[in-house]
Amino acid sequence: MASEPDFIERMNFYTRRGIRFLFIIDYEMEFPVVLKLSELNGFCIKYFIDGVKNYDDNISNIFNKKELNIQKRPISFEVYKKAFNNVALNQKNGNSYLLNLTFKTPIEINFGLEEIFYKSSSRYKLYFKDEENEFVLFSPETFINITEGKIFTYPIKGTIDANIPGAEEILLNDKKEKAEHLTVVDLLRNDLNIVCKDVKVNRFCFTYKIKTNFGELLQMVSEIEGRVKPNLMYRLGDILFNMLPAGSICGAPKRQTLEIIKETELYKRGYYTGVFGIYDGKNLKSSVMIRFIEKKGDDCFYRSGGGITVYSDAKKEYDEMVEKIYVPIY
């Protein structure tokens, strides 16, 4: 574990030297992990980052073949509504116009977390275990990718059941979802402008499907690009520090919204909604740590949530939070 200044300087040092490394940064940036890839053998960490991995595919064969069974025990709507109302009041008063409200849901699942890692399908996956933490995630969301001096980010906001007739048209024309997506795109453009120049939106509001064990979801995404400022070219630690927490999992305006999240959620998010990624000596790939299961003692909890705006309906947001509790094993 590294302290905040340490992880920034360590990442900057590794970048200047072209040293390959993995990073796992928690939401509060209190317990960041930055490790050379050559050091990973001594840690219980497995990753799959857009095709880059540190394990043998055949290892999944050691687990028994069985059908996934997951039971959700979500909080009551009344508990959710109390938190939602606090967010809505702040938005009515102009303190925030987008806030990502999250909860942890107790679940019962017949797979271990490491088994979930090996058997799940996702663009980004991570299994992590140490003396205090054990979690697995299977995230569809890119944080930033850096290639040849260009940064790309792909904010995801807007979700619908893909099996609904006309789902894509409904999603793209939903006033609340469109407003939420536009807000997070604008927020991430602003975040990129801190570390980049020539920031532009290459693609706005396109959709893609993700598979779950309950069916398919359709999500709305955009692509934003910028060129890294020359003074930050070999300072990945500073780039990440200036952009965290990820805009898509907090809201806007960022500073005020972070305070409202703190007073509303009443618990630390920890590694959930942080970021992780890999630097290969030249380029960087990273993901937002969502679709997240953690184990505390004998109990498992699934973390999920969604963006709240003035257009939000509490029951729909509650249902979306529960709908996002899935494991992509099929």
Identify the role of each PLM range.
Residues 1-330:
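Extended alpha-helical targeting/anchoring segments
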